[in-house]
Regions:
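An amphipathic alpha-helical interaction segment
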Residues: 1-13
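A short, Lys/Arg-enriched amphipathic alpha-helix from helix-turn-helix/homeodomain DNA-binding modules
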Residues: 10-39, 45, 72-88
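Basic/polar phosphate-binding segments, predominantly the helix-turn-helix DNA-binding elements
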Residues: 26, 38-71, 96-119
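Short, basic, alpha-helical segments at the C-terminal edge of helix-turn-helix-like DNA-binding modules
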Residues: 71-80, 119-128
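Active-site pocket scaffolds in enzymes
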Residues: 83, 95-96
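Residue-level recognition of oxygen-bearing side chains
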Residues: 88-89, 104
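Hydrophobic positions on the alpha-helical face of helix-turn-helix-like DNA-binding modules
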Residues: 90-94
Length: 128
């Protein structure tokens, strides 16, 4: 996962204009500012007056992966942090990172880290 917030747009990607890179960065900021919120690509595209396809291309070009994969990785990283540093329940962690279905959250988490959320927490020595 790349963090390009400190890179000038002109250096972030040579294939896109400064405006296109700026749109991608602004989209990244929107989708990661509150992980509980869901922002459909078509809605974001309309907000920036570009097509959904263009928006997805800008994002992939700047961040190296599509919006949904990027967001899933950010959500899982935040979930791992919460599991390791708080005593929130797995259900609360799932909700904090945008999953209303705890089972789906646990499945995605295990696929990402190779451990269930509770196993991960135990491995970080914070079991209740």
């Amino acid at each position: 996962m790349q963090n390009l917030n400190d890179i000038p747009p002109s250096q972030a990607c040579t294939f896109f204009t400064e405006t296109q890179v700026d749109i991608a960065k602004r989209v990244e900021k929107i989708i990661t500012s509150d992980l509980r919120q869901h922002h459909p690509a078509w809605e974001l595209a309309a907000q920036f007056s570009v097509s959904e396809t263009s928006l997805k291309n800008y994002f992939r070009g700047v961040f190296g992966q599509n919006i949904s994969i990027y967001l899933r990785e950010v959500r899982m990283k935040k979930a791992a942090e919460l599991l390791a540093t708080t005593r929130l329940s797995v259900a609360e962690v799932a909700e904090q990172v945008g999953y209303m279905n705890q089972s789906k959250f646990a499945s995605v988490f295990k696929k990402q880290f190779g451990l269930s959320p509770l196993e991960y927490r135990r491995s970080k020595n914070l079991e209740n």
